[in-house]
């Protein structure tokens, strides 16, 4: 009997030793539920929308309207919970076991010295420890901004200037490069480059987030090219959107306003913007969000009448004082196209004239041209949609897919202006991120829709309805001489202004005028033609009217990754990364051509409708970043 007890005791001891590790493993991997309430330390009122995350992981949730939260995850004790909310100090709380319900009190924070930024070093860090100058606008700053939209609030950031080319097209600039198209200022949304591949610049916030989905904006007004490439040599901005895990529910806003009050040239008009957002998370593992917005308004019309080519310039007619001011026959209007004397086009030189009794006199005369307000459409809109799906693979890893699409109208300015009409930009992004790594791939697609170039439109309106420059010049000279014959046979300072006005009227006979059905019909025809040349003996493949269409279709493929090796390196923090990018340009036979085809055939479509082989541009890059803190983090050495 005693032997039996000994055997049973030995067997029990062995089983307990085998079960103990399994029990420990089960404890380490058991599903732990932590719940509690978050309140304001001073008022003791519940705080809704407080972010609750597990430190060192991607797991998290937010408090409800009563300040309550519940978080389930497979954890090992002890662990830390991080509580954060706009306007309150971030607080960490250690959870040692499954005890009572947590009661957390957050203290208000008036000075945002402990804000965390990501853009400066590609890793989270205190804004005061950032190695470069960086500005951050969080939700509280954006809400309190007097700007009409969060995107306009960028103009209030130190070192940033905003250039407004159109109601839907606003361009942030830094370092004094205040130009309509800042190619070296990178604009990111959650790390994605928003540029349109063929235009080379982002189209404002055409497919960016709405105010309902923006979490913060980080702006680096100085060079950031070491970590982000040459496109960031003038600086960069990163628009960071809300996580569907942390910001759930349904949101909606409607804005309305009136612009051009008290202005001239047109009546006041309405401005409207509508947006809706919905986000939902399931079991802290899966979450999604959708955003939809629509903006519509009437753009400002450029209508400056300043003469860029006054009569005292050599490109005008300085020898004839009678042709000064309103009588300038070489007038080059600021917001007029088709009269571009200073550009060396749209002008004729009339020689062999006798003026004031002097033979062999020459007049420089500009074509009449068209005002910009008659060539562009001031009614603009911006419709955009985005959706995202997030899945937490583990405590430290999250996989997400984002899709964005936007349609916009507006005016884009380079050497001259481009009317953007039904431009569509799309973006697909797939991202895998962990506590110390990130892999991201995205694709952008651009389609310029029904856009057109304003200058060739004006040129071809004149050329198609008023004749070539030489033919128009001949009619002008003939009318000038006829006027002289009918008025004593002489051209003098006294009648030169009236004579040139009569000659222009005769030369413009048959020219289509704005506001007429003939003008609208010819304008529509020219906009639909993707060849800016008019048919002639030297350009036999062009159309009779010429064209102004801007047909640009392109794709951008990008992949990047980064790895934080700080835990593997003992003496300093090390971050490595790299990227690769491919631009795919589809030839249109006008703006972009297939150079492998004969010159005469590059503007002619092939049997399949294409204009040749697609054009590819490739880029690869890599970076290394080392940081070391010394003297109890009072000194930070940084190199990249």
Model-derived features: positions:
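Outer-envelope beta-barrel architecture signal
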Residues: 183-185, 246-250, 284-288, 395-399, ...
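Short, acidic, small-residue-rich periplasmic hinge/interaction motif at the N-terminus
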Residues: 31, 35-55, 80-88, 96-143, ...
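Short acidic/polar hinge/loop motifs at secondary-structure boundaries
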Residues: 70-72, 192-223, 276
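Extracytoplasmic beta-strand/coil segments of soluble accessory domains associated
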Residues: 72, 134, 151-196, 215-216
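Outer-membrane beta-barrel translocator/receptor signature
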Residues: 212-215, 221, 226-310, 381-383
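Face-selective signature of the C-terminal outer-membrane beta-barrel domain
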Residues: 429-640
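Transmembrane beta-barrel strands of outer-membrane/channel proteins
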Residues: 250-258, 290-296, 401-405, 439-445, ...
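Short, acidic Ser/Thr/Gly-rich low-complexity loop/linker segments typical of extracellular
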Residues: 58-68
